[in-house]
Amino acid sequence: KHKNENINREMVVQNTLTFDITKQLTLNADYSFKWRLKEISNRSVKVPYSSKEGTTDYIDNFRSVDSYHQQLARYQTHNYNVYLRWAPTWDRHSLTLTAGYNGEMYRYHSLEAERLDLMTEDLSSFNFAKGEVTELSESIKTYATNGFFARVNYNWAERYLFELSVRADASSRFAPGYRWAVTPGGSCGWRMSEEPFWEEI
């Protein structure tokens, strides 16, 4: 009557919002939530054998134990993203300004227990166990991240391209005083194929 059971339940929710404030200004936001529940249970019973008629013995090894083991674990993840985009154009100039925020929150909670000697082989429950508690543990893990960003893109006639950006990111996994990091960046480009002289080549 050994029995192993593994149950997984999962739920995912996603929402997205796009709002055109003006023709050139847009607000974008999205949120997602993921929830998962995992349940693992193991029921072991002693394995009987008979060496002669009228007697019953039990195999004496780690596989022949009357026990019930259960683990319950729950996972939760929240993700947030919000950013504003402004993209004006005039003459042969194009400018795009983007600024926003993203964040994540994660939590894991697990309970695990095992107890020996159940009163009946037909029921798997700690309520029917009267033996030693061989395992009882709990695990909790959490973390959160936050990030702010800004970016400027400019191009003239799709020929000369410039970009400047900066990010500020933080994580609860690092010690206080060391959680934030600021990362600037920049680039420029020249699309030679858009030059008038290229048409003559």
Regions found by a protein language model. Give the residues of each.
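Extracytoplasmic loops and strand-loop junctions of Gram-negative outer membrane beta-barrel proteins
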Residues: 1-2, 60-69, 85, 129-137, ...
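Outer-membrane beta-barrel transmembrane strands
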Residues: 2-42, 68-89, 96, 108-110, ...
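Outer-membrane beta-barrel proteins
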Residues: 37-42, 46-47, 52-53, 93, ...
